[in-house]
Structures are given as C-alpha cells and as structure tokens.
From Swiss-Prot:
The keyword DNA-binding applies. Core component of nucleosome. Nucleosomes wrap and compact DNA into chromatin, limiting DNA accessibility to the cellular machineries which require DNA as a template. Histones thereby play a central role in transcription regulation, DNA repair, DNA replication and chromosomal stability. DNA accessibility is regulated via a complex set of post-translational modifications of histones, also called histone code, and nucleosome remodeling. Residues 17-21 bind DNA. Its main location: nucleus. This is Histone H4. SUPFAM superfamilies: Histone-fold. The keyword DNA repair does not apply. The modification N6-glutaryllysine is found at residue 92. Glutarylation at Lys-92 (H4K91glu) destabilizes nucleosomes by promoting dissociation of the H2A-H2B dimers from nucleosomes. Residues 1-14 have a biased composition (Gly residues). One of its GO terms (molecular function) is structural constituent of chromatin. The lineage of its organism: Eukaryota, Fungi, Dikarya, Ascomycota, Pezizomycotina. GO terms for biological process: nucleosome assembly. Keywords: Acetylation, Chromosome, DNA-binding, Methylation, Nucleosome core, Nucleus.
Amino acid sequence: MTGRGKGGKGLGKGGAKRHRKILRDNIQGITKPAIRRLARRGGVKRISAMIYEETRGVLKTFLEGVIRDAVTYTEHAKRKTVTSLDVVYALKRQGRTLYGFGG
C-alpha cells in the first residue's frame, strides 16, 4: 500500500470483485430436514406441513434483526469484519444473552 491510509482503494481503477452478491432467496437453504431436526431437539414429535415456511419466515426476521445490529456495531467501530463479539452484543441488545463467546 502506498500512503492511502486505512480503508479503501482510493481513486483510479477498482479491481475485480472478489465476492458477487447473489440475488436469490437463500432462506430456502434452510431445508425441511434441518427444521425437523431443530424441532426434534425442542421435543416436537409431529410437524405440520405448514410449519416449514412459517419457520423460515420467523428465522429470517430474527436473523435480519441480529445481523443489522451486529453490522451497526461493526460500522461504529470503523471495521469491515463482523466479529463474534459484535454478534454477542447484538443478541444481548435484543434480550437474548449468549455466553461462551467473550464479552
């Protein structure tokens, strides 16, 4: 790096993008068996067919909130990498304290 400081390529040509943003609904990656395993862990014996889409929706809403808060902590600290502590603080802010990851 030649005197550009901390953060950014400066002016001029930008390099090739390393990560492309895929614009599809990744929530379908939470498979039916994965939801079934989570339910089994919670003690559920039988699962209605409508539960799967409902669970995906609730999970997406929950994760959007946690990720938004974690990214806010990251941006405030002028970092580009979200750390485990950012997630711990985001969960704590939402009233779901998580132990075992520092903080």
